[in-house]
Amino acid sequence: MSDQHKATLQQANAAITAGDHEGFLACCHDDIVWTTVGEGSLRGKAAVRQWMRENYLEPPRFTVTRLIADGEHVAALGTLEIVTDGVAMPHAYCDVWRFRDGRMAELRAFVIPDSTRDA
């Protein structure tokens, strides 16, 4: 099951980088809980969709350096560039996803600015 969860996450990530929010959301449960540690939580696809519309005006650019799977969980570690007003800001991240019935049900995202690398 872990390999299937990894494949689903990779499919969802590909949709995000292509700007395909609906393709990403198709990999999620309707009652998804998306928590960015230190910022708050979104509940449900409608809330995630709205957040993406507001915050992913340009698709984020990210590189997954490691996927670690254990049972119903997959952790993705990597780097992320978020473009705001035409300026790419480098970040480091770790997303911990919980899967249910083959789809993403919960995210705990740890995202921090990374001034040690260039965008």
Outline where the language-model segments fall.
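A beta-strand edge to alpha-helix "cap/lid" segment located at domain peripheries
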Residues: 1-11, 33-35, 39, 47-119
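Short, well-ordered alpha-helical segments enriched in acidic and aromatic residues
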Residues: 18-31
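Short, conserved phosphate/pyrophosphate- and ester-handling motifs at nucleotide-, phospho-/glycolipid
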Residues: 44
